[in-house]
Amino acid sequence: RFAHDPMAGGHRMWQMAGLKAQRAQTDVNNKQAAFDAAAKEKADADAALSTAMESRKKKEDNKRDAEGKLNDELAKNKGKIPGLKIDQKIRGQMPERGWTEDDIKNTVSNGATGTSFDKRSPKKTPPDYLGRNDPATVYGSPGKYVVVNDRTGEVTQISDKTDPGWVDDSRIQWGNKNDQ
């Protein structure tokens, strides 16, 4: 009467198979959730990349437009002399350094050849006696140059064309200003 019930073993097998199937389904569900999360993360990253690329393209287009406008202005103003202001100190140096006002205008009209800075102290900037801390443009060539303050148009320095040993101002960076 207490003999082994063959159905009891079969039921247990089915029960074990059901548990394995349940675990497998849970595993599949977890992996699907992880896959869905990764897919959403990828979609978000793709959207961010697309936005960044659009932003970069707009900035590059704006830069290209600005460079085009700058080049148009440069072409339009090529050979034109900026409103030069020559103070008494520079006028006093001109004859002894081999310069005339026409020499200065001609040198400037040939175009920029470098950059510098105007860092004159207040006592060296009559009539306003306000110190300067401005970018400046260099015209000419080493040993034969004119430096003009970009903001004020003042000629801030002329080299000594008569002195073959003239040492250029250390603030001068030679090279076409528009190529930098």
Swiss-Prot record:
EC number, as in UniProt: 3.1.-.-
UniProt keywords, alphabetically: Antibiotic, Antimicrobial, Bacteriocin, Endonuclease, Hydrolase, Nuclease, Plasmid
One Gene Ontology biological process: killing of cells of another organism
Residue stretches of biased makeup (Basic and acidic residues): 54-76, 160-171
Pfam families tied to this protein: Colicin_E5 (PF12106)
Region described as Disordered: spans on this chain: 24-143, 155-180
Any one GO MF annotation of this record: RNA nuclease activity
Family: Belongs to the colicin/pyosin nuclease family.
Name of protein: Colicin-E5
